[in-house]
Amino acid sequence: MNTSLNWIKAMVPGLECTDQEFRDAMTLSGTKVECFNAFDKNLDKIVVGQILSVERHPDADKLVICQVNVGSENVQIVTGAPNIEVGSSGQKVPVVLDGGKVAGGHDGGALPEDGIKIKKGKLRGVESCGMMCSIEELGSSREFFPDAPEGGIYILGDDAVVGSSAVEYLGLNDTVFEYEITNNRVDCYSVIGIAREAAATFRKPFNPPVVTKTGNDEDVNTMVSVDIEAKELCSRYVARVVKNIRLAPSPKWMQQRLMTAGIRPINNIVDITNYVMEEYGQPMHAYDYDTIAGHKIVVRTATDGEKFVTLDGQERTLDAQTLLICDGEKPVGIAGIMGGENSMITDDVQTMLFEAATFDGTNIRKTTKKIGLRTDASGKFEKGLDPENAMEAINRACQLIEELDAGDVVGGAVDVYPDPVTKKRLPFEPAKYNALLGTDVSDEEMLSYFERLEVEYDKDANELIIPTFRQDLNRDADIAEEVARFFGYDNIPTTLPKGETTMGKISFEQSIEDAASEVAQFTGFSQAMTYSFESPKVFDKLKLQADSVYRKTVVISNPLGEDFSVMRTLPIHGMLTSLSTNYNRRNKNVKLYELAKVYLAADDVNELPDERVEFTLGAFGSVDFYSMKGVIEEFLEKIGMKKKPTYDAKAGIPFLHPGRQADVYYDDKKIGYIGELHPDVADSYSIGERTYIVVIDIPTVTEMASFDKKFTGIAKFPAVTRDISMVMPKELPVGEVEKIIEKRGGKILESYNLFDIYEGSQIKEGFKSVAYSIAFRAKDRTLEDKDITPVMEKIFKDLEADGIELRK
């Protein structure tokens, strides 16, 4: 938001401060000023001069010698400007006197930081005591002064007073401030809003424009009707009519104010609507009344696929959420964004229909994105406007039309306002505000702040009445903030917080996840982070059956694309994508882990999905099934699950190798799965090595985990180990061996460890060699052979009964 300081001062009489003082005070009171630009920064000793005569230069064909009246004296100036010709006289021009400064050169290039100083000198032997200026030398451009000649001296109007300040005459004695306005302060997206804040900040009176009654004795309600069909998207629509339009340039004061806002003047009618939009923050639109079929306005939504050509000549395809302004037969504008080519204002216009309305900001914002068209007006509407502002703004526009004699305003207004807004009321609780702020501001002082902000006080009800333009004031904290702004944040004393402090801690579930990360990192895995969104096509890549529960997903209503259209139900795709990327970049021995959240859709679409964290491991290279199994057991031991997990090879997981996979159980409860990636799935992800996957369900293990530690003394007696080697059928899982060891080991069994598996030419076909190390220990004595041998014989006997051959 940009505003002119002179425009602000017109509404805040008595405001006297430097540009820097204004910036600092406004920023401290909550209206942050990003930067400011003083138009007259490098303009000095520039006056209105009148050319008395122009003669040829005796020694230069392209130079002329001018005698110029600058008020206090006549000076001689030599110039080469193409629009100053021999024999001409009477023109009034900006003249920089000897010792003065201009902002830049006549070429309109980048302005030098300190401007250009002008000194008396000679041009081809003829003395020149100053310089006549182009608009570029004054720091402006032809964009804002369209009547300025290209490369020539700027000719001032006949009303310019010789000897007076040319800078002031051109409106360049001004400073433009750029504000950072937050979206909750919609009222500050207007000059009136900024001026109100400035008046409150500097404790000056606030005098907004006084809008007088306008219009002739006719009644506009006999000329046009308005019907709002989409009431939820248009809360108010005001229309007025102006007859006998007289297009002309707008006055210089209006052009100057528009230029400070970055708006190029066009003509009186267009300039008035732009002026009111900046002044009130209320966009307006004008239609050629004679093109409005039936002289009727209908506010409705479009039909899906409806076509409409906007003022820029572009045909746009609309949907059922697009709000349209229509006449009795056709659309004439996209509400709040741009009018239609079919109702465009031309130079021949005789009668105009003016519109000031309040449209739903969210709808306008969505429409601008859909059709790819954003305008100054839509930028205002998107933020949500005050419906009470519409009538005031359109009446102000009609007042300016009458003052500038731009047309004849028809009396009255068509005002369709189905559900008028009411002013909010909040209890006045000064003690609570002081407690929140740590201040001691009196009730009277607070009420003086609110009075400056146009917040009324109902003494009988002890309530604050909030004006409709302050949509941001909704609760105690908002009111306390207003007190802080005008008491002064820099005046609030620094105090230490009172009360007891408590030390935060992580949840038990987070402790489990941290333990998973520690184990993974300790065993050489690097953390991966992948998207929770994926494509439904992933399920086919993973070979999931058509009726798989994992195909039931939470669908995203506004996805970035098909590849991100559903929430994942398995953590596998993201992990395999990361492994594939590493493989294709020729990285070797890749080991990744992720604490991936999955989303399992509920049977009832109105219920939230079951969100579960899955501890996921993926690796290829120097890993195998058993090293991955070791990570599982290390993790379970870390979180207090001391028993050995069991494995069921009949897992039936489609994306894992059918003979190299298993469900993982603990205390007969499934906690996850492990396996080698199915070769077909590996091919679909372009992974050319054996890849292993582990998934552990964190919520399930959390129920069984414990970080309670029981300390025992160091064993007094040594352990005795026995190694056994056996040959067993390939299809028989080693878990069967471990069951026998646990069953027959008795009380003296301390631990066992699988340390070798071998398949090769020395082992008969269909079999594998397996070796275990078994440790025995007693708490009360050193074990002897007579203690261990019976136990080992029981183990051997059960192994042989299962068809396992011992190697001796």
Language-model-detected regions and their locations in the chain:
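Conserved mixed alpha/beta core segments that line enzyme active sites in large multi-domain catalysts
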Residues: Q50-V78, V162, Q256, N267, ...
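Extended, well-folded interaction surfaces typified by the phenylalanyl-tRNA synthetase beta subunit core
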Residues: G193, L426-K588, R722, A775-R777, ...
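A carboxyl-terminal module marker
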Residues: N2, R452-V455, A602-V605, D610-E611, ...
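Beta-rich nucleic-acid/ligand-interaction surfaces
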Residues: D40-D44, T214-N216, T501-I506, T530-V549, ...
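Phosphate-backbone binding interfaces of nucleic-acid-interacting proteins
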Residues: M1-E218, L353, D376, D386-P387, ...
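Glycine/proline-enriched, intrinsically flexible loops and inter-domain linkers
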Residues: L5, M11, D24, V64, ...
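Terminal amphipathic helices with adjacent charged low-complexity linkers/tails
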Residues: F202-I228, D405-Y433, D440
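Mobile "lid/hinge" segments at catalytic clefts and subdomain interfaces of large enzymes
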Residues: S128-C133, E137-G139, I153-Y154, V167, ...
